[in-house]
Amino acid sequence: MASNAALQGEDIPQPQESPPDTACMEAQKWIEQVTGKSFGDRDFRTGLENGILLCELLNAIKPGLVKKINRLPTPIAGLDNITLFLRGCKELGLKESQLFDPGDLQDTANRTTGRTSDCNRKLRNVLVTVYWLGKAANGCSSFSGTNLDLKEFEGLLAQIRKENEEIESPKRSIRDSGYIDCWDSERSDSLSPPRHGRDDSFDSLDSFGSRSQQTPSPDVVLRGSSDGRGSDSESDLPHRRIPDVRKDDMSARRVSFGENKAFVPFNQYLPNKNNQTAYIPAPLRKKKAEREDYRKSWSTATSPLGGERPFRSMSMCDMRYEEEGSMLPHSRAHHEHLQHVNSLLKEEDDTWQDDLARWKTRRRSASQDLIKKEEERKKMERLMSGDSELSDRRKSIKTYREIVEEKERREKELHVAYKNAKTRGEAERILKSYIEKFTISEAVLEGLVMPKILERSQSVEPSLLSSSEDPNPLKYLRQQSLPSPKYTSTVEATVTPSSPCESKSPTGLISPSKNIISKTVPMLTAKPYSQPKNTQEVLKTFKVDGKVNLNGVEEQKGKESGSQTFAAPSLTRSQMFEGVARVDAPVVETKQDVASIKLNLARPNTLNSLHESNSLCEDRNHISQKDEPDSFVQEESVHSVEQLSEGNTQSNSTTQAVPAVSSIEIPPLTVNGKDTEDKRKVEAAELIMHWSLDSNYKEAKKNSLPPLKSSENVEESSKIKENESSHKVQLNITLQTRNAWRRSQFFLQSVDTECTEKSPALVPNLSSPNRSCTWDPEEERKRQEKWQQEQERLLQERYQKEQEKLKEEWEKAQKEVEEEERKYYEEERKIIEDTVVPLTLSPNSNVHFNISERNGNFIPVLPDHAKRDQENNNGQLMAEPNRVIKNEIHMHSNVTQQQILYAHERSMLAAEETQIKGKTEKWEAEPCNHVQSNECNTPTRLTLQAGCKQVMLSESCDLGSPKTPVDENAVHHNMSSIISTRGIDSKEETLNSSQSTSQCQSPNRSVSGKKLCSTCGLPLGKGAAMIIETLSLYFHIQCFKCGLCKGQLGDATTGTDVRIRNGLLNCNDCYVKSRTAGHPTPL
């Protein structure tokens, strides 16, 4: 804005007069009076240059408006103070157009561009601000100083108005499109405050012609340097921010358009109908008749729409008041009228701006709400329509149920794919690909069924299985996933065939006359990383043709052994890895029964469920080893299973081969667990049990007939001797390895070291057929018994430590209880000694004692010998109830016969209660401390408490009912005789009574900081408990049950409604039933 002002200053040079001295002097005088400080020898501008006086002036008008004044003698400090002053003026209500610029007070004497007119203009701006500030101070309630004389500023205002009128004169209207474009381009939005320009107004000069015909409006002239850049320019216009009514024509145009009012236009010197002497554009010079004829021509020349515009709009400048013609343009009435109109316009403009701001805020918030609702609606539509992106993202966030279902589905697909594999390589690839993607568990491995194609290939094409490959693709993978066992196991099995008739009975004798053909039997390793469980005593049994469930239940397919063609015995996955196997081994294309092998492992004698069956097998194996000196051990590789398949089809072999399982030791795992993958593979390979055949059997195999041509059924069974007299009893027993201890603590490190030392690693040589190693069950049993004794010793020590710890805690709790009870009894004793007056009784049975009455008379009490029988029946009575009676009689001297009878009945009841307590005290003296903690909850005490309640009820009923007169002497004699029978000190009896009573009254008192269960009476302990503090009820979680249906109330996961009715816990159902039955609920 400074640039355009400069341009105008160059194009329109105006002589600048100095501001009136009266206004300057009045402003200086007023500032000195208000602030109390003098300008001194400085002039007006120099005195205000540092801004200190201005800030103090503001604080004097409204205290605290300027909080901090910078008093440093630097130009920057002066600018800071002036900025604070202008900000405070805004808070007082002054507008931006009424304030001077911070640079107006700067010293420009040393500048080459400085002119006298420029300095005068800046000084006038400061005086105008002081004028408006004084006007605001006059109306400020917090200001009590001298008021500014506004009349002194009339000369200044008249001078500014005159100069403004000269600039607004039509003679100075410049039709220079270049100047207008230059002014508009320099009017930057970022540097000037936001306001409506002329082009946005209703009466824009575009109505009269194109943009090039615009004239700078007075609004532009008056606000020439409002953007803060015009202060230092050399030729800025002198008419900015004057207190005149014509400086805000924008508001007048906007409001007048909205309300259809014919206001006096602010720009009264612009061309209009009534002002024909002013400059009028060429089209308006036409006559009225000519305008109708040539409307299209000038409309085409001035409007971009050409002839399409049938009419032209009338500017607000063309509308005037009717009486405006009678007013002189420069009259005082006209001036006052304009001021009034301007004030109305200001108020309406402020209201309009507020309404606009509120509307924008409402519109913005409503728009944001609509946008949010629209986004939510679209999101729901995408969800309902199944958008792929959202559905995929939603699928990526799965619940636990979905994860479990997906895992089960994957495992099921693995089972089906593995079972339907056509080749060994395909099955292996299926399993490997699954293990690479997912984690496979033991249950999944156990549930896998060997592909049928592989089972048939082992029986139909045995030559294909004679390679050195592992017949089971799971073996290598299983070995990688399992840790190495840490023990050595040696097993020997003797295999003999049986006759057809004998094989039909499971326990029939096997004929030894058949040629013996050895058959490989897989030796299965244990899984030492599982914990032993007594519930795992049941041995798992697996079949080749059966499906094995996860719980060990076997689904067997019924197979007839007489007329079917059976597959050769093959090793399923479960047989290879689980350690417990059962193999039915029929021979191809025969009608013989299925031969089976039973392999018995001697188990330790610790599990009772396995002890009986294992001991018999151990004895038989031991006898068999003694009677078979020619048995040998020869290790065989894994692919000997295929060699066995070929050997099963051969017939009439004269060589008897008794294969045995060699002793294999698997080295334990390293402690650090940092073995490389190659080492782990080597260790996994050592897990495989190698079986070997006799070399004689191999020679016979070479000379034997081709496979699939033998019709003889080769049956395998364990050769067992029943007794020491060499009587051999052959049993057809199924192959079954009992390996229940594979998860036991037998594989602890201490036992591992011992086993490793006793059983060094054996590396059998296939070329030495005579190499044999016997398995001594006695040595094995001794070693296991020793281990068992060690475990029992450790368990016993642990048990002893736990018992000692519990005993110490129990003793500590008892001590705390005794200390607490001692303190409680001590307090009770002190209270009784302080409140109760002891009675001194005579040992004589005929005691005469007097009860003093308030009137000073004495009532003699005579003994009645007829009441002695009743005394004996009542037993010993404590002194406490009688003292209560004495005190009552002493306090109520004028008692009637009714009250005496009530006292007599109460003493009788107290005697009965004391008798019960005397019996209970003997029971309480027992040495069991834990019984003492529960003595108040015994049936006797509970009955006593209930009886006391009934007595109180009966007493209250007796008070209101009339009684027959009773002999007063008899009553007093009864009382005295009862008291005399107690030849014990009353203090002692009182103490005992208070002790027993206090114990009965507080059954739920804290035991070493722990509450007693309200149901069972035992301490709550450290377990879960339900506590109701407000009712002093405490329950174990197992005791927290309904008193009617006995249902648990504390096991609900979603919360339980518990009602307490008649002292019993009620569940919600029982409570509703009792309410519907009509039982009242006590408060």
From Swiss-Prot:
Coiled coil (UniProt feature):
356-424, 784-835
Mention any Pfam family matching this sequence: DUF4757
Protein name stated in the entry = LIM and calponin homology domains-containing protein 1
Q: Matching InterPro entries, A to Z?
A: Calponin/LIMCH1, CH_dom, CH_dom_sf, DUF4757, SM22_calponin, Znf_LIM
Q: What is the organism field in this record?
A: Xenopus laevis (African clawed frog)
Q: Which gene encodes it?
A: limch1
Q: Which GO terms describe its cellular component?
A: cytoplasm; stress fiber
Domain named Calponin-homology (CH) is located at 21-138
The protein's location, in the record's own words, is: Cytoplasm, Cytoskeleton, Stress fiber
Job description of the protein: Actin stress fibers-associated protein that activates non-muscle myosin IIa. Through the activation of non-muscle myosin IIa, positively regulates actin stress fibers assembly and stabilizes focal adhesions. It therefore negatively regulates cell spreading and cell migration.
Q: What GO molecular function terms would the record report? A: actin binding; metal ion binding; myosin II head/neck binding
Q: Which GO terms describe its biological process?
A: actomyosin structure organization; negative regulation of cell migration; positive regulation of protein phosphorylation; positive regulation of stress fiber assembly; regulation of focal adhesion assembly
UniProt keyword Transferase, yes or no: no
Q: Name the UniProt key words of this record, in alphabetical order.
A: Coiled coil, Cytoplasm, Cytoskeleton, LIM domain, Metal-binding, Zinc
Q: Which residues form the LIM zinc-binding domain?
A: 1011-1077
